[in-house]
Structure formats: structure tokens, C-alpha cells
């Protein structure tokens, strides 16, 4: 029976023989999701969604619950690992032209938006200083929506300010959204295996495919082992590496932190938001920074799918990576002279990539045709 099952996996899932390690991040994301749901479930057992008890319940989990510190740290560090994997996954998609499989790319972008919402709700739950103020600042952006803004914000808060109903509904949303992520991931995987994955060359893989098991399965397991090893190393040697010191203080609506900022994985979008000195403009730029990814399948102009053979576009791609990193860095800094200009310049450069990429593809086609 076991041999029959193995044969089924081998025969039903042929995969291109030349896909590199960059194609392993899908399975790493699946591992992260399982890890987050498992640890999240055990944390939810001991967590109390009440503004007076939430902070104390997190301390109780860390100090008193057997292995609670492992659950709490794995969940917090696991979220950062999740975003490292997803950003690498997206970067690989942009570099190798995976976005040309439109249905897979658009379902993946939807997944990213749901994941960011889930992570934001989760960041509010410990009810520390930064949790409270990040929630206040980000949810306040909804008031920029013409006509409906104030109504939508009041509805989300469950009152006229962030209070107990807000925390309760954020906990409910943080609990339910991962199950929507599982459903969306299933759709994402079904759509992917409908046509099959692309490869580093950007050519059709049909002529040279090998069974997923054992070749790619062992490759996946190697990467999963490395990721879990990294997780355990961070958890044991630097458990607060990704934490904000402000969040070790209980939320106080009367004291504003000197510098309000979300978790590191939102800093690029937050940096773009801050660079525009207008509330509605900043909010639009924030949403556009993620939604703009959906335009890439429709603006691809090059005859070549992958950037592996397009040196000019490679320069543009690595400029985007440098820009992303710089925006993230400036968002950690206070809003003052050098950082304001740097974030404005890098924000323009970030959006310029999505305009320059099709233009450069068109120019490369012209160069190739004239050779």
C-alpha cells in the first residue's frame, strides 16, 4: 500500500529537473503556516482577549505555562521567518517571470494581503505600548476614505476609540484568517500544478521532468531542516531580536511612544506611507505598494520570460531590492531632515520599477531585433 502511494506521488507530480533552491520557498511557507497555526492554537488556549488582562496573560504564558516560552517565541519569530520566506518567494517570482502564470500570481498577491492583515491583528494582541499605538495609527488611516471613513473606523473599533471590543474582534480575526489562508493556499497550489512551475531558464519544462519524490522532496526537507535550525538558534540565543522594547510595557493611551513603528516586515509599506505629507495620499500609496504587484503579469513586454538573460533588467531588479531595504531602514528612523528625503526618493524608485520594467523589456526587444 505504501509503495503504491509513493508511486502515485511520483507519477502524478512530475517536476522540471532544473528548478533551483529558489523554488523551495513555497514548501517553507507551508511549513511556517503549519508551525504558526499549531503554536497559535496553544497560545490561544491561555490568552485572554481583554484590555486589562491581555498583557498579563502573555506574561503568564511566558513565565508559568509549561513550555509556554517556546510557544510564544516560536510564534513571534515564526512570523518574521514567514515574511522572510514570502518576500524571497515574491522576489524569485519577479526575477524569473513566474508572474506570467496570471492565476497563480494573483492568488498569491491576495494571499500576501490576507497574511499582512493577519500579522497586523496578531501584533495588537499582546496589548503592549507599540501594539496599542500601531493599532491606533494604522486603523486611523481608514478615516481618510471619503464619506465612509469615520463610519468604517468606528465599526472596526467597536466604539469611538480603541478599547475592549477592538481587542476582542482583532483576536477573532487573527484566529479565523489563518484558515482562510489555508483555503487560499490550496487554491494557489492547485492553480500552480494545473500548468506546472516555470524554471530558471524560463523555458518549457515538459521535455525534461523528474518525479517530485524522492528528488525534490529531499531537497525540500533539507531547506525545512535549515529553516527550523535557524528558528531554534534565534529562539535560544536572541529571542527578542525582532521585538520592540516599547512592547514590554503595558499599553497606556496617555503616553505616546517617541517613535511609533510596526513590525519590521511592514516597514517598507509604512516608510512609503510616511514619505507622503498627506493622509489620503499616504494611505493610497500604502495600499498601492502591495496592490501594484498585480500589474506585473499585464505589463510584461520582453520576449524572454526570465531575467537570467536580461542584464539591464537585472540591474533594475537589484535596484528594487536595495530600494526595499533602504525604505525599511528609513522607516525605523524619526521623521526628520535626511530621512524624509531618503524615504521620498526611495518611494519614487520603488514605484518606478513597475514603470521601468516594461519599458526596459521593450527596449531589450528592439536591441535583440537589431542584432
UniProtKB/Swiss-Prot annotation:
PROSITE patterns documented for this protein: CYTB_CTER (PS51003), CYTB_NTER (PS51002)
Residue positions binding a ubiquinone: 193
Co-factor: note: Binds 2 heme b groups non-covalently.
Keyword Ubl conjugation: no
UniProt cross-references to SUPFAM superfamilies, sorted A to Z: a domain/subunit of cytochrome bc1 complex (Ubiquinol-cytochrome c reductase), Transmembrane di-heme cytochromes
Membrane topology: Multi-pass membrane protein
GO biological process: mitochondrial electron transport, ubiquinol to cytochrome c
Top-rank lineage group of the source organism: Eukaryota
Alphabetized Gene3D superfamilies for the sequence: Cytochrome Bc1 Complex, Chain C
Keyword Nucleotide-binding: no
Cellular compartment(s): Mitochondrion inner membrane
Function: Component of the ubiquinol-cytochrome c reductase complex (complex III or cytochrome b-c1 complex) that is part of the mitochondrial respiratory chain. The b-c1 complex mediates electron transfer from ubiquinol to cytochrome c. Contributes to the generation of a proton gradient across the mitochondrial membrane that is then used for ATP synthesis.
Misc. comment: Heme 1 (or BL or b562) is low-potential and absorbs at about 562 nm, and heme 2 (or BH or b566) is high-potential and absorbs at about 566 nm.
Family per record: Belongs to the cytochrome b family.
Name used for this protein in its record: Cytochrome b
Gene label: MT-CYB
